């Protein structure tokens, strides 16, 4: 059970690090994937499963990093237009469509299939879900705190207005 408490401490520390803005450091997902790879490879001990897992994880990590870097650098933009199927057509409505970037993370999971997900991949996804859940809880707590402050502020404002009105009428 000593390993469980260290894992809990690591998760708490990682959550605290996620809430603090960082600059140009490797993403938490990359660190978690590397950590899980080291732990999983020691427990699995099979080179074939290691190669298969390395390729899957590097593909998914590269896809996530590509999508994240693209959205950070370029911001929201419309995708490029498709070329018309009939180049000789003039003045008419040309069949225009948009190429949408597919959700690469979902595609990787769909390609792998749920049957092929081993314990290591499930552990990686579980940890990512825990990080996301922790962020959500922190945001919910922050929202509750702001609602409490707003209620207190408006209560004080109304009280001061009533006291001011009472003093004005008394004069």
From Swiss-Prot:
Q: Tell me, what is an example of a GO biological process annotation in this record?
A: negative regulation of mitochondrial calcium ion concentration
Q: What is this protein called?
A: Fetal and adult testis-expressed transcript protein homolog
Per the UniProt entry, what species is this protein from, by scientific name? Sus scrofa (Pig)
Matching entries from PANTHER family are given as: FETAL AND ADULT TESTIS-EXPRESSED TRANSCRIPT PROTEIN
Instruction: Give the main localization category.
Output: mitochondrion
GO function terms (MF aspect): identical protein binding; ubiquitin protein ligase binding
Matching InterPro entries: FATE1 (IPR039153), Mff-like_dom (IPR039433)
Q: Describe, as the record does, how this protein assembles with itself and its partners.
A: Interacts with BIK and RNF183. Interacts with IMMT/MIC60and EMD.
Report if keyword Endoplasmic reticulum is assigned.
yes
**Topological category with respect to the lipid bilayer:** Single-pass membrane protein
Q: Which residues cross the membrane?
A: 151-169
Alphabetical keyword list? Apoptosis, Endoplasmic reticulum, Membrane, Mitochondrion, Mitochondrion outer membrane, Transmembrane, Transmembrane helix
Q: Give the record's GO CC terms.
A: endoplasmic reticulum; endoplasmic reticulum membrane; mitochondria-associated endoplasmic reticulum membrane contact site; mitochondrial outer membrane
Where does it localize?
Answer: Mitochondrion; Mitochondrion outer membrane; Endoplasmic reticulum membrane
Which domain of life, per UniProt? Eukaryota
Q: State the protein's purpose.
A: Involved in the regulation of endoplasmic reticulum (ER)-mitochondria coupling. Negatively regulates the ER-mitochondria distance and Ca(2+) transfer from ER to mitochondria possibly implicating it in the regulation of apoptosis. May collaborate with RNF183 to restrain BIK protein levels thus regulating apoptotic signaling.
UniProt region (Disordered), positions on chain: 1-27, 68-92
């Amino acid at each position: 059970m000593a390993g469980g408490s260290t894992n809990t401490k690591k998760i708490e520390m990682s959550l605290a690090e996620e809430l603090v803005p960082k600059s140009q450091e490797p993403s938490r997902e990359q660190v978690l994937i590397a950590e899980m790879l080291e732990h999983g490879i020691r427990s699995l001990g099979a080179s074939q499963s290691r190669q298969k897992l390395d390729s899957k994880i590097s593909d998914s990590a590269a896809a996530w990093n590509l999508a994240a870097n693209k959205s950070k650098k370029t911001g929201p933009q419309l995708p490029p237009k498709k070329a018309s199927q009939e180049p000789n057509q003039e003045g008419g409505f040309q069949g225009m469509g948009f190429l949408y970037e597919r959700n690469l993370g979902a595609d990787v999971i769909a390609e792998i299939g749920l049957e092929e997900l081993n314990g290591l991949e499930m552990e990686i996804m579980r940890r990512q879900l825990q990080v996301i859940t922790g962020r959500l809880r922190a945001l919910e707590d922050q929202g509750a705190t702001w609602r409490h402050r707003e209620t207190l502020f408006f209560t004080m404002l109304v009280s001061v207005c009533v006291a001011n009105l009472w003093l004005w009428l008394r004069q």
